[in-house]
């Protein structure tokens, strides 16, 4: 174990994390120049196209240091986007150290700070790295001072590098060897292996990524997943180099994968402990906090016949993504689909795009909402994932919405505009921290205000220089209300929303205006009602189309005309009573703010 080093690379999105991983792999000779490609650890097409890391990946590197000793370096690459911050904490739990990468042209950003404190809380040794020093607009000295004032890291400890050209990468490798401690563990103790991640393989079933904390694990041995007490026999095991490489043993301190015919992802819960059936451990390792979805949206196929394909796609995606939640939903207006839970808007976008690409399904995805906590009259609490499922007010004591602690890092000159935006979004100021050229703005804001257009507006008013990080804080009582839309006395469930009292008039007025534009006129009036607690707060009418029944009456007796008009009047009454209007789905999408993306 003396020559093993386990480390992660953590950074804000687009600070050069994957490029540095590529360079480390190339220098350690794990892959030939012919096989080398950009973002080699980003195996999904989506990761390469978007230039982001979505799933944490691991690779074993062999490095001969200046002291002539050979070292095994286990690198776990991590995502940079805030939506996937849970992957960062999971990766760090398998490591003794981390490279904190900061772009020398952009400086410290919100997610940089979040990752830094996450590593500090987990007592991870940090090696600070200033990347992209080859860029013309990089300012290493200025950013070094920024790091020193914000994080307390001395400038002389910061390594300057360019992952693109390879400058400074050898210095990083030497720092990993010299400054990170080897793993702590006992080879003679009962096996304790932490499950870092798990995913589905078409041939091997569930593959489990583990870090051996104590003991050794050999191929063919029987293991116990400690939370379920289920016993499995190891069929294959190995490590990534970055290609999947088989081995017969994983030793104390190492990171590797095992395949043991586990059929579903629940069979190997992330954060669980694996031990030997023949020599079991009595204690489980400390796991991870359970991840709960933050954002919910409904997904429907545009063609109802594709429902089964959508169901199969979600089942398979959830095998590789334990944070994806879904349940069956049937909407009167949109048909059969699923209510899905995501970690954030990027996570939602990734899932949608993977479903469309990998399963050839054209999808409709509704406007995202948050989960609400309800304190009922009998003092029981329930959590509701969809506004249409919120009970009637007479059964509710309190409606509570999720509140987030929102940190914004921005140049000082945009402070006024950002504060105005936060106030507009019902934010309460918690703190302002002034730095040399920047300011950290901390606000408590309802999550429902964050998940729609907050980030886009923030980028717009700061010319793209502000960065955002937010974490769930608690559920707070809200004065928001459930608004329902009825068309000809029929509830349109997909138009049920939770709206803050300040926006009720604006929302109801806009909804009626938009519906009047898109509902096709019939031979009877179509009445639109906006209701709160069954009380009508706004009304609109799509006027009927008048059919000229006298068109063929060229003159003649007036009584004949009166008879035809009376007959028409009776017919219209009957049509209004039993007639169904047709509301085109495309029209409904525009009202719902729904994203409908074609392939």
UniProtKB/Swiss-Prot annotation:
Chain sites annotated for binding GTP: 14-19, 131-134
Gene giving rise to this polypeptide: lepA
Function: Required for accurate and efficient protein synthesis under certain stress conditions. May act as a fidelity factor of the translation reaction, by catalyzing a one-codon backward translocation of tRNAs on improperly translocated ribosomes. Back-translocation proceeds from a post-translocation (POST) complex to a pre-translocation (PRE) complex, thus giving elongation factor G a second chance to translocate the tRNAs correctly. Binds to ribosomes in a GTP-dependent manner.
Protein name, per record: Elongation factor 4
Cellular component terms per the entry's GO annotation: plasma membrane
Any GO BP: positive regulation of translation
Domain of life: Bacteria
InterPro entries: EF-4, EFG_III/V, EFG_V-like, EFTu-like_2, G_TR_CS, LepA_C_sf, LepA_CTD, LepA_IV
Annotated localization: Cell membrane
Membrane association type: Peripheral membrane protein
Gene3D superfamilies according to UniProt: 3.30.70.240, Elongation factor 4, C-terminal domain (3.30.70.2570), Elongation Factor G (Translational Gtpase), domain 3 (3.30.70.870), P-loop containing nucleotide triphosphate hydrolases (3.40.50.300), Translation factors (2.40.30.10)
Entry EC no(s): 3.6.5.n1
NCBIfam families: lepA, small_GTP
Family, per entry: Belongs to the TRAFAC class translation factor GTPase superfamily. Classic translation factor GTPase family. LepA subfamily.
């Amino acid at each position: 174990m003396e020559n093993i080093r386990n480390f992660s690379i953590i950074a804000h999105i687009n600070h050069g994390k994957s490029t540095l991983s590529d360079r480390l792999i190339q220098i350690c000779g794990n892959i030939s120049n012919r096989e080398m490609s950009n973002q080699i650890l980003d195996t999904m097409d989506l990761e390469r196209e978007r230039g982001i890391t979505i799933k944490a990946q691991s690779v074993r590197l062999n490095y001969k240091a200046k002291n002539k000793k050979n070292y095994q370096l286990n690198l776990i690459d991590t995502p940079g986007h805030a939506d996937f911050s849970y992957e960062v904490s999971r990766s760090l739990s398998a490591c003794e150290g981390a490279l904190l990468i900061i772009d020398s042209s952009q400086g410290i950003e919100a997610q940089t700070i979040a990752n830094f404190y996450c590593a500090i809380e987990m007592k991870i040794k940090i090696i600070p790295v200033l990347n992209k020093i080859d860029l013309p607009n990089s300012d290493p000295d200025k950013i070094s001072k920024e790091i020193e004032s914000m994080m307390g890291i001395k400038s002389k400890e910061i390594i300057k590098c360019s992952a693109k050209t390879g400058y400074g990468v050898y210095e990083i490798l030497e720092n990993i060897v010299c400054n990170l401690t080897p793993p702590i563990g006992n080879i003679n103790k009962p096996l304790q292996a932490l499950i870092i991640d798990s995913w589905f393989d078409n041939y091997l079933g569930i593959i489990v990524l583990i870090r051996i904390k104590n003991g050794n694990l050999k191929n063919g041995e029987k293991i116990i997943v400690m939370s379920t007490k289920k016993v499995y026999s190891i069929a294959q095991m190995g490590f990534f180099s970055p290609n999947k490489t088989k081995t017969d043993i994983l030793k104390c301190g190492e990171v590797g994968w095992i395949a043991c015919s586990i059929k579903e992802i629940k069979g190997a819960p992330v954060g669980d402990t694996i031990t030997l059936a023949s020599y079991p451990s009595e204690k489980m390792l400390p796991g991870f906090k359970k991840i709960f979805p933050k954002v919910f949206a409904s997904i429907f196929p545009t063609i109802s016949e594709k429902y089964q394909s959508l169901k199969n796609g979600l089942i398979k995606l959830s095998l590789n993504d334990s944070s994806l939640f879904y349940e069956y939903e049937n909407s009167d207006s949109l048909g059969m689909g699923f209510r899905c839970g995501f970690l954030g808007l990027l996570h939602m976008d990734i899932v949608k795009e993977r479903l469309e690409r990998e399963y050839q399904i054209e999808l409709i995805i509704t406007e995202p909402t948050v989960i609400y906590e309800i304190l009922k009259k009998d003092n029981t609490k329930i959590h509701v994932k969809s506004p249409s499922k919120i009970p009637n007010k007479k059964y509710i004591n309190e409606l509570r919405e999720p509140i987030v602690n929102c940190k914004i890092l921005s140049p000082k000159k945009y402070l006024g505009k950002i504060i105005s935006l936060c106030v507009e979004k019902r934010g309460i100021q918690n703190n302002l921290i002034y730095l040399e050229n920047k300011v950290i703005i901390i606000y408590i804001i309802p999550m429902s205000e964050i998940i729609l257009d907050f980030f886009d507006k923030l980028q717009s008013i700061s010319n793209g220089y502000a960065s955002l990080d937010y974490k769930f804080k608690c559920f707070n009582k809200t004065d928001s209300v459930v608004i329902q839309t009825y068309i000809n006395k029929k509830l349109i469930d997909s138009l049920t929303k939770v709206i803050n009292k300040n926006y009720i008039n604006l929302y109801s007025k806009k909804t009626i205006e938009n519906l009047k534009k898109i509902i096709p006129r019939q031979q009877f009036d179509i009445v639109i009602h906006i209701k709160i607690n069954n009380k009508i707060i706004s009304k609109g009418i799509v006027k009927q189309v008048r059919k000229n029944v006298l068109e063929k009456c060229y003159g003649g007796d007036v009584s004949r005309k009166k008879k035809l008009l009376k007959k028409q009047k009776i017919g219209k009454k009957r049509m209004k009573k039993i007639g169904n209007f047709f509301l085109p789905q495309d029209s409904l999408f525009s009202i719902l703010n729904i994203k409908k993306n074609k392939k």
